Amino acid sequence: MDRSRIEKISKALADKTRLKIFEAISRSEKMTCGEIVSMRGVTPATVSHHLKILSEAALIECRRQGQFVHSKAVPGTIEAYSRALAKIAGGKKSAHRK
C-alpha cells in the first residue's frame, strides 16, 4: 500500500462520525443510507458526504439495488492498512529513542 493511500484512509477514519459509520457498516453485511441515518441521528446529506469519503478511501463500496444504495466494507482493506502502518512503525528507529 502506497503512502498516499495510507494517508487517504487515515484521513477518512480520523473523523469520529465517519469512524462510527464505518464501524456500523463493517459489523453488518450491508447498510442503506436510511439505516445509517436512523442509527447515527444525522441528516441524509451528512451520511452521503461521509459515505463518499469512505468510498473514495476504498474502505466501503456502494451499490444501487433498486431504489436503495447499499454500502458494505471492502474486505481486506483494514488488514492491508494495518500491515502498512506496522511496516512504517517498524522502520528505522529515531536517534532520539532509547
Protein language model features and the residues they cover:
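Amphipathic alpha-helical dimerization/coiled-coil segments
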Residues: 1-6, 23-27, 75-98
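Solvent-exposed, charged/polar functional surfaces in cytosolic regulatory/catalytic domains
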Residues: 16, 54, 80, 84
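Intrinsically disordered, low-complexity cationic segments
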Residues: 48-49, 95
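Short hinge/loop at the helix->beta-strand junction immediately C-terminal to the helix-turn-helix recognition helix
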Residues: 30, 58-59
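Alpha-helical residues within the helix-turn-helix
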Residues: 38, 49, 55-56
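N-terminal helix-turn-helix DNA-binding core of bacterial DNA-binding proteins
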Residues: 4-45, 65-77
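Core alpha-helical elements of the protein kinase catalytic domain
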Residues: 23, 51-52
